[in-house]
Amino acid sequence: MRIVFMGTPSFAEVILRALVENEDKKIEVVGLFTQRDKPFGRKKELKAPETKTYILENHLNIPIFQPQSLKEPEVQILKGLKPDFIVVVAYGKILPKEVLTIAPCINLHASLLPKYRGASPIHEMILNDDRIYGISTMLMDLELDSGDILESASFLREDYLDLDALSLKLARMGATLLLSTLKNFHSITRKPQDHMQASFCKKIAKADGLVGFKDAKNLFLKSLAFKSWPEIFLENSLKLLEVELVENEKSHKEGEILAIDERGVLVGCLKGSVRIARLQAVGKKPLKAKDYLNGRRLKVGGILT
């Protein structure tokens, strides 16, 4: 079984690794299509996608392609690889009709479709406080995340997970699911999506990290969803790090400092309160909340702004 893999970030790297290292020798990854290296950090040094890095660091004999688009001659390159399946996991490009007709294109999407079609399904699961997390394999068509569902898997949330932890758990679950889909593809009964039940999610922007002290639960969920980027911050760009939901019932003044100790600062919201372990001002290193407040001469009863 010849597989062309299309994927870019660490989530996709987990899936690629599972395909390459799978004990079933019938599966062979014959090519990787991924996004181009991008400038990273203050020095803007080029950083390779995680999928590409995995192949290079392990000296795997898998050709790597980083095209600007999936037009000619990329279509001919794909045909030349003679794939039985094209597997797409967080690739970052729309597949044109010319690619979709080369071989069955299977997308692993991090939601229980038709829920959360689009670019940020894992963020949405967290932000919406979902009790059930899941992942789906789908036969791709020309529309965004709208193809027939092949298989799905899910689990009941026991503890709150931040974006990194939930992504890793879903990726590992997705790797197992994808292997099942590939092995059983011809016997799987495809399930058309109910488009009337579809919901959509957008690409995360820097502005999404802006928070205020109105709803403690909402602030806490944002801290989980945006942990890696853009993080959460107040209007003055003060970052709130390591946020814990204390309660979500009592009413307080927005940003009122209720208590300060070694664990952090307890801050009141219009609904509920949160404990913040560390704070980071613009251009500064993160500080323990207690040290930051001492430097600003903020005490219990003051307002964190």
Curated annotation (Swiss-Prot):
EC number(s) given by UniProt: 2.1.2.9
Catalysed reactions, semicolon-separated: L-methionyl-tRNA(fMet) + (6R)-10-formyltetrahydrofolate = N-formyl-L-methionyl-tRNA(fMet) + (6S)-5,6,7,8-tetrahydrofolate + H(+)
Gene3D superfamilies linked: 3.40.50.12230
Ranges that cross the membrane: none
SUPFAM superfamilies reported in the protein's UniProt record: FMT C-terminal domain-like (SSF50486), Formyltransferase (SSF53328)
Top-level taxon: Bacteria
Family of this protein: Belongs to the Fmt family.
Protein name from the UniProt record: Methionyl-tRNA formyltransferase
Species this chain originates from: Helicobacter pylori (strain J99 / ATCC 700824)
Phylogenetic classification of the source organism: Bacteria, Pseudomonadati, Campylobacterota, Epsilonproteobacteria, Campylobacterales
GN (gene name): fmt
